[in-house]
Amino acid sequence: MKIGHISDLHWLDLSGARIRDFFNKRLTGGFNLVAGRAKKHTKQAVIDALDAMRASGVDHLVVTGDLTNLALPSEFKAVMDTIDGYFDAAHRTIVPGNHDFYTRESARCDRFCHYVYGDDRSAQGDCILCGNNPWPFAQIRDDVCFIALNSAQPRPWFVAAGRLGTHQCDDLATLLARREIASCYKIALLHHHIVRVVKAPGESLRCLDDRKQFLDTCQNGGVDLILHGHNHDFSQFKVGNTLISEAGSCSVSHFKRDNRAGKFNIYTIEDKRLVDVATWRYEDGHYKPWRHVTPSDFKSLPIGDIP
């Protein structure tokens, strides 16, 4: 199976937006757009990534959050209309990022789930849920299990950190113990990063608050691969028996540092093993193959080194 991984699309669409829609945290997002984010992240780069994935024979698409810039209805509709043209609901798994839960209003009405999954997740027969909780849920495709988690929640201005909460970690452990899941190659999906790549004072305002609890649950439950976004940076780590991977933002078409260029990954799973990770990089106006690695190339980190 070939699994395509994109993240941090930051799709911008202000159709129908009103002035009063910006009397909240969107005000800071608006300043970021004026300051250059709107030029840095482009829709065409996302479309080029999806085109390249389709041409490469990707079987299943994974999106690890930040589909939108400001969690506006117009943004969700436009980005999902685009994704629908490449991968239908049976061939994709999507989790939210902090930009998809940008305001309390967008979280309260669960705009993300309305546009991405519909209003009744339990009506989707292929989703394995834990009781009445919407997150996490599992989807099994062949011998691969995708477990989707929600690390996004409305936070104060200038805070972009994530949290899963005890109930999601407990439900994750319950899902991992199920017989039909335990026998699969298990991939956990969330938006926020676990390993603090940049050790700056403000990093605590960006990373996953309960990353140690989450990683312990993954280790104990036999998660093979964790895919995330949020950093807009390429990184590949191995902690214990669990691989952790981020390609970067797939929508970045203008960049100053090479590591911040638009990227996406294609993971090849054979016989319940990850055999190849192909990373594509945006340059000269389109995506090109950049590098291939195997699990042995991931940087090993002792569990105690996760700050």
Model regions: which residues?
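A short C-terminal boundary segment appended to hydrolase-like catalytic domains
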Residues: 269-307
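Beta-strand-turn-beta hairpins that frame and shape the catalytic cleft
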Residues: 1-4, 136-148, 177, 183-185, ...
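Conserved beta-sheet core of the metallophosphoesterase superfamily
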Residues: 84, 203-272
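Active-site environment of divalent metal-dependent phosphoester hydrolases
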Residues: 10-14, 69-72, 98-106, 154-159, ...
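Extended active-site neighborhood of metal-dependent phosphoesterases/phosphodiesterases
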Residues: 73, 78-171, 219, 266
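N-terminal active-site segment of His-dependent metallophosphoesterases
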Residues: 1-76
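Active-site-proximal segments of metal-dependent phosphoesterases and phosphodiesterases across multiple
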Residues: 159-163, 179-224, 231
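Active-site neighborhood of phospho(di)ester-bond hydrolases with catalytic His/Asp-centered motifs
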Residues: 5-7, 60-65, 92-98, 150, ...
